[in-house]
Amino acid sequence: MKCIINRRAQFSASHRYWLPELSAAENQAAFGLCAQPYGHGHNYVLYISLYGDIDDYGMVLNLSDVKHVIKKEVTGQLDYGFLNEVWPEFRETLPTTENIARVIWQRLAPHFPLVRIQLFEQPELFAEYTGNNMEALLTIGTHFSAAHRLALDSLTLEQ
C-alpha cells in the first residue's frame, strides 16, 4: 500500500534581494525594503512530503532518519544564516521563497522519494515546489471582512 508522509522543519534565516547587474537605484526601485544592505529575516516553516510503500513495520520511511537528513542537508546549514552566502545557488540568483523551495528539493531529492516541498516565509506566504524544473507556485493568503444586510425588503431597518 502506498502512502504520503509529511515532515515539518523550521529554520530562521535572512536574505537580501539584490542583482549585481542593476544599479543601487534600480535594485531599490525593484525590491524596496528587501534590497536593504543588511537584508531582512524570516522564521521559515518547511514541509517535506514523501511517497512510498508502507513497509512491514508500518512506515514509509523511518522519520528519525528523515529528520537527521533534513538537518544535515538543509536546516543545519540555513538556520541563522544569510541565504545569499550560505549556499552557492544564491550568490547569482535571488533567494526568493520559490527559489529556496526549488534548491531544497534539489538537495533532498537524492535522499528521499519527494512529492512536494512547501516553504512558508510567513503564514500568508508560501511556495510549493513539486520537482518540475522551475514551476514553483507562490501563494499569498489574505483575509477580509464585510458588513452586509440580511433582511427582506418589506421589513424596516428597526424590524
Question: Can you say where each PLM-predicted feature lies in the sequence?
Answer:
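Charge-rich, low-complexity N-terminal segments
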Residues: 1-159
